[in-house]
Design a protein with these regions (language model features):
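Extended, compositionally biased repeat/scaffold regions that form elongated interaction surfaces
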Residues: 218-396
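A mature extracytoplasmic/lumenal domain signature
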Residues: 4, 14-16, 52-54, 76, ...
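Active-site-adjacent mobile loop/cap segments within catalytic or ligand-binding domains
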Residues: 116, 126-128, 134-150, 164-218
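Active-site/substrate-binding loop(s) of hydrolase catalytic cores
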Residues: 7-13, 19-159
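Short conserved micro-motifs at the rims of enzyme active sites and ligand-binding pockets
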Residues: 83-84, 197-201, 275, 367-368
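Short beta-strand-to-loop junctions in surface cap/lid or active-site-entrance loops
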Residues: 1-7
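Extracytoplasmic/secreted proteins, especially bacterial periplasmic and envelope-associated proteins
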Residues: 26-30, 67, 71, 111-118, ...
Length: 396
């Protein structure tokens, strides 16, 4: 549910832990009913989203985990901040001293994790409701906006303010992931596992809304290797692999109509305001398709049954490329395969096994078994500069 159209996006998220914390689903639903009836309480600077459940399968099944048996609040990429204690791990700690391998096979492996990651890309603040502890705590790594939000919320609700969750160590937590991107993020723990604590938490949300301009900081532009990067492009770049996947920024961003575009070593990232509040607000340009323009490539034969074939293009993913594509949210970042595996010159001048996708190309480095994106962003920048009719070109 959405109320308001202001620039400061605040999300209230219930029921990450499914059935055992169903009272957070009830709370978020009641808050949605209240603000639907009282939209005037949402200031003009805010757009408020309320998500009653992030884990509908766990809610239906009565389990803490999603349908794949993964704890969603241990599945986020929390390796982005400066605190190694909260880094993602498959082996996680939980209530009553229970430890289990439920962090997921890799960070953000679950569709629910990817959805909340992409939805919060442009958020100023987020409140994740859990139970039961009767306290409020902010993102783990020192993040002043999260701390201020938690203190304000605790004062208004009467919950205890804790700088950290003290019962066990949380790895892969959603609030820590959000804080690492500059989003003010807190977890209020309801007093028990039954009651919704509606009055207390309504007072907490109202207190935040009254102080929204102070407590919900707008996303900030950053500088990477001396190059300025717009706030939302930076968040996307950081959240999806940063220099490891996209490489560094090559030049400042430019504006093309409503689209903000920036060249990176291995991609061109585009900020498209018409896609606000969707996973495509920032998206890689189709550099793989551009690189193959005019080239005829064979479609994988029917006899090739190993791997995963995409009906849309007729091409197959297998082996190291398939594993890389899966772990890197391939449909979002790379798109569909546009070729099968090819033997072709890679960026280092060596002939390597390569594969092209809508938004990029991958090369296999057999020396270490690693897969690396090709620097198509460099090629696109050179091409753009050569085609720039306003630039002074050298003729020899």
């Amino acid at each position: 549910m959405k109320i308001g159209d202001g620039p400061r996006k605040l999300a209230l998220v219930g029921d990450t832990h499914g059935g055992p914390e169903a009272n957070t689903f009830e709370l978020a639903s009641q808050l949605a009913d209240y603000f639907r009836a009282h939209p005037e309480e949402v200031p003009l600077s805010v757009r408020l989203y309320i998500i009653p459940t992030l884990n509908p399968d766990g809610l239906a099944l009565g389990t803490r985990f999603n349908a794949s048996g993964v704890d969603l609040n241990r599945n986020m990429n929390t390796d982005l901040d400066a605190c190694p204690e909260n880094d993602w791990n498959n082996h996680v700690q939980g209530a009553y001293g229970v430890e289990s391998d439920t962090g997921g096979p890799y960070p953000e492996s679950e569709p629910e994790s990817g959805l909340i990651r992409d939805f919060l890309l442009d958020a100023a603040g987020v409140i994740f409701y859990h139970s039961d502890g009767g306290d409020v705590f902010p993102a783990f790594c020192e993040h002043a906006p999260s701390i201020a939000l938690a203190q304000t919320y605790a004062t208004a609700t009467g919950y205890r303010y804790d700088r950290y969750w003290g019962k066990y160590n949380i790895t892969g937590g959603m609030q820590d992931w959000a804080g690492s991107l500059g989003i003010a993020a807190v977890i209020p723990e309801l007093i028990n596992g039954v009651d919704a604590d509606y009055d207390q938490n309504l007072a907490g949300v109202q207190a935040v809304l009254r102080q929204a301009d102070a407590l919900l900081p707008l996303p900030e532009d950053r500088v990477e290797q001396g190059v300025p990067v717009p706030a939302l492009i930076w968040r996307y770049w950081k959240a999806h692999g940063g220099p490891e996947f996209f490489g560094p920024p090559l030049a400042p961003a430019t504006l093309d109509g409503a689209i903000t575009r920036q060249f990176f070593e291995r991609a061109v990232l585009e900020l498209r305001p018409d896609q606000a509040d969707t996973p495509y607000l920032v998206q890689p340009a189709p550099l793989g398709r551009a690189a193959l323009a005019g080239r005829a490539l064979p479609i994988a034969g029917e006899g090739d049954r190993e791997g995963r074939t995409f009906a849309e293009t007729g091409h197959t993913l297998r082996g190291a490329f398939a594993d890389y594509w899966d772990r890197r949210d391939g449909m979002l970042l790379l798109g569909l395969p546009l070729s099968g595996e090819l033997d072709a010159p890679a960026a280092d001048g060596q002939r390597r096994t390569m594969q092209y996708f809508e938004r990029g190309a991958l090369a296999l480095y057999t020396e270490d078994g690693g897969v690396c994106p090709e620097p198509l962003g460099w090629a696109a920048l050179v091409r753009a500069r050569l085609q720039d009719t306003t630039a002074a070109q050298q003729i020899r």
